[in-house]
Each structure stands twice: as C-alpha cells, then as structure tokens.
Amino acid sequence: MRLKVATRGSRLSLLQTEEFLAQIKAVEPRVDFEIKIVKTTGDLVQDKPLFQIGVKGIFEKEVNLAVLKGEADIAIHSLKDLPSEISPGLVLAGFSKRTLPYDAVVSAVGYDLESLPKGALVGTSSVRRAEFIKSLRPDVRIEPLRGNVDTRVQKILQGKYDAAVMAAAGILRLYGESPPVKLSLLRPELLPPPPGQGIVAAVVREGEGWLIDLLKKASDPRATVEALAEREFLKNVGAGCHVAVGGTAFSRNGYIEFIAGYAASGKRFVVKLFGEDPVEVGRRAAEEIKRVAASVR
C-alpha cells in the first residue's frame, strides 16, 4: 500500500512529516509513502509580516489543494497553521505526539525575558507574540522577523537581533537537545501559545473511511484531546493572525487545564479553566476571552 503525502519543503516540515509517518507505520507496517513537496504562499512571500499578507491559511492552502485534486492522499501540517475551518471536502484526521507547546526567548547568549537589556531588538512577525512581549517588556524594541527556523536562528547568531520569540517545538525538532542558540521557555501564563503549537496534523479527503480510521489509530491520544479543545477555542474565539490571542490545553489523567490569553494596548489578560470535555472547555475559554476583549475595546 503506497500513500502520497503532500507537505511543505522546509527542513522542519520534512522532519515533522517523517515523524508522523513513522507513527502511521508503527500501526500499519505494510504502508509506504511518497513525499510531494508543495510551495505555499507563506513560503513565497517573505518580505511582509504574516498579518499583512491578507490571505487565510498561507501555510496550508496549497498543500490541502494537492489532496483535493487527488495529487496526494494526505496533507501534513503544523496544526497551528491550520485555520479554524479547513477547505470543504477535507477532514482533519490525525494528530502526532506533541512537542513542547511553549514559546521561548531565543538568543545567542541566553537571555530570558527579564534579562533582556533595555532597548534590545527582539524579532517576531507574530502579532500575538509582539503584543504580549510589549505588555511584559515595553522597554524593548520589536521588529519583524520572517523566514524558516534555520533562517531566523542564523539571523540571531549573526547579531542582527538580540533575541527572537519563537516556538520551542520547531527548534527542538530541528536541532534536538543541543541547538546552536539558547532557549528560555515562556510559561503559558505569561505568553499563551497559539492553538495547536507543537502538534503535527494530517488532513485527508472526506469519505476516505479506511484512511481516516488508520490515522485515528495512529494518533496520539493526549494530543488528540488537546487538539480538540484548542480547535474548538480557535473556532469560537474568531481570531486570525492579526489578533493577539493564544490558547493551549494540557490533558492529564482525563482532566483538562486550558490557559488562554489576549493582549492589546500594552495590557495582557490571561484566564485558566478546567474541565473534562475538550469541546466544552475550549468553548468556555473562547467565551471568556471574547468577554475580556470586549471589555477593553
């Protein structure tokens, strides 16, 4: 049995794809894979911050299109790149084991949020990261930083930025436990990660029952629960990449802790909720964030 798999061509995307395909192979050893590399809008447009590109799903649309057109059987994504609603005719069918969902202060010298010098140049093209950092350290300068993980790491090592705020998962997946830069993890109470960060997801065509069943069997149970909660949060909060909203779930022993936050105008607001039903917890977290956001406008 041979499956065609569509994915982006960055080193991180290919590593994530290999990891997830190994999960599938572990439950169905007879399956083989053929990789189809797809260029996305987000890969091609590198001279603008993400929120200025003005297109939804800039890292996923073209990859999913390959599946819709029958050029591939599975599309592999970072879950955080998937909008709340994916293209009609497709279904989100599987989730990898989760790497750390946290963001991190990334630098050559080991800065954490507190030790960044006044006036330090911090790189990020994420509105969420920028607004939360402004609320925590209004005395640092924030400038756009685009490119794949390797490119951003090199710009830090070259001294073009004092630090950057990046997903810890990407750096750990690329470089393992000995990256060329130093990471200071940011607790979600300080900077709530985006929904889905650290999880790799598989998208397939609707009606592919056997393939959906295979991906469900290969999925990590804990990541699946957390993904359900975070996707429900994303769907109900109604925030795109131009709004500083984050939310992440932690599933332990059948119980879910959900941390969500909103930042604007130099202020940040963080809520913490608990429950057993991932959909219900995600929906409640979204309602809390919408209430908070409405009160500060």
Swiss-Prot record:
GO BP term, pick one: protoporphyrinogen IX biosynthetic process
Cofactor note: Binds 1 dipyrromethane group covalently.
Disulphide bridges, residue numbers: none
Alphabetized InterPro entries for the sequence: HemC, Porphobilin_deaminase_cofac_BS, Porphobilin_deaminase_N, Porphobilinogen_deaminase_C, Porphobilinogen_deaminase_C_sf
Domain of life: Archaea
Keyword Translocase attributed: no
Keyword Transport listed: no
GO cellular component, one term: cytoplasm
S-(dipyrrolylmethanemethyl)cysteine found at: 241
Entry's EC annotation: 2.5.1.61
Requisite cofactors: dipyrromethane
GO molecular function, one term: hydroxymethylbilane synthase activity
Entry keyword set: Porphyrin biosynthesis, Transferase
Pathway linked to the protein: Porphyrin-containing compound metabolism; protoporphyrin-IX biosynthesis; coproporphyrinogen-III from 5-aminolevulinate: step 2/4
Reactions accelerated catalytically: 4 porphobilinogen + H2O = hydroxymethylbilane + 4 NH4(+)
TM helices/strands, residue ranges: none
Note: The porphobilinogen subunits are added to the dipyrromethane group.
Function: Tetrapolymerization of the monopyrrole PBG into the hydroxymethylbilane pre-uroporphyrinogen in several discrete steps.
HAMAP family recorded: Porphobil_deam
Family: Belongs to the HMBS family.
Protein name: Probable porphobilinogen deaminase
